[in-house]
Amino acid sequence: MPATARWTARKIGLDGFTPGQINELDTNILIGASYLKLALDEFRGSMPLAAAAYNAGPNRPRAWRNGPTLEAAIWAETIPYGETRDYVKKVLSNTTDYAALLSGRPQSLKSRLGSVGPAPVDEPVLTKDLP
C-alpha cells in the first residue's frame, strides 16, 4: 500500500522516500517491520490485533475487539474477513513455531498470545493516525 509505506517512512524518519523504493528489498523489510512495530505499540503488544491491523488496517481490529474477552486463538476465528482470519491464524501459528525453534523449547500458543477484548476506557490511542 503506497500511502501506508509513505506514512511509515515519514514516521520512522526515512528521508527522501519515494514509492518506487518499496520494491527495494532492504527498504521493503524496513518499512514492513516498522509498520508492524507501530501496530504492536498501538495494540499494546497484542500480536493478534497487530497482525489483523497489518492485514486489514487498524480500524477493523479496533472494532472487532469490542466483543467479549476471548483467548486470542478463539478470537481469531471470529474475524469476519476470511483473508484476514486466515492471515492472523498463520502468523500466530508461525510465530509460535519459530519461537519454539529459536528457544529450543515448546511454546504454548495460549500463553504467548493471551486474550483479546475491549480496550480499557482509560487506554490512550498511541498512534491514532495509524493507517
Give the positions of each predicted feature.
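Catalytic and substrate-binding regions of cell-wall glycan-acting enzymes that process beta-1,4-linked
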Residues: 45-104
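Substrate-binding/active-site groove segments that recognize
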Residues: 1-15, 25-37, 59, 91
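Short alpha-helix boundary/capping motifs
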Residues: 33, 68, 119-120
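Hydrophobic alpha-helical bundle architecture
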Residues: 37-44
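Short, contiguous acidic/charged loop-to-helix segments that flank catalytic cores in large enzymes
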Residues: 11-27, 41, 76-82
